[in-house]
Amino acid sequence: MPNNYKNENFMSKILNEVLSANRDYVNNFGDKGELALPPARQFAILTCMDARLDPAKYAGLSEGDAHVIRNAGGRASDDAIRSLVISYKLLGTREWFVIHHTNCGMELFNNEIMSDLLASSLKTASIDENGWHDCCEGHGSTEGRYINWLTIKEQTASVLEDVLRIKNHPLVPSDIPVYGYIYECTTGRLIEVPEATAAGKVA
């Protein structure tokens, strides 16, 4: 879990590192500026924002290959579906993946825990064997009670739930297959969720 950094020092270090990396990237950018807007391989991935996951590596992507939509948990939220609909309707993707992962942070809390932590303080919380704890510094907000945080109880069930939500959405055509997988953080392997892929097959 994150430590309590002194923001001004931490962010300036990160900012410098990012800008330095970008300069290196620019120097080796080559002809990427000529890439077409639609993804060349015509598929999209919905996956988690977890920093341990690199879809470009685990799915063999280069710039311009595919759309990668990321949020906490890789959940089929309204905004994720908005992006998927744009992905096919305007940019031509024809196959979609829902990829959750093992040891996901979204399994460590629920809506009540999150809203209570936010009501206590807006500072970063910590977790130990006894659960989540707030530092209780500064003010909190009760606005978290009005958000569905889309937490996860069990990965197989959550992948199936998200595939079904996508397939049943009125803006999603029936001829787009949706594949359900779990990324194994300890090995890098993609493990199929057969019931999810079956639910996501072309009608």
Specify the residue positions occupied by each region the protein language model found.
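Gly/Ser/Thr-rich loops at beta-strand to alpha-helix junctions
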Residues: 49-52, 102-106
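Short glycine/serine/threonine-biased micro-segments
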Residues: 58, 62, 71, 103, ...
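Ordered, amphipathic secondary-structure segments that act as subunit-interaction surfaces
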Residues: 91-104
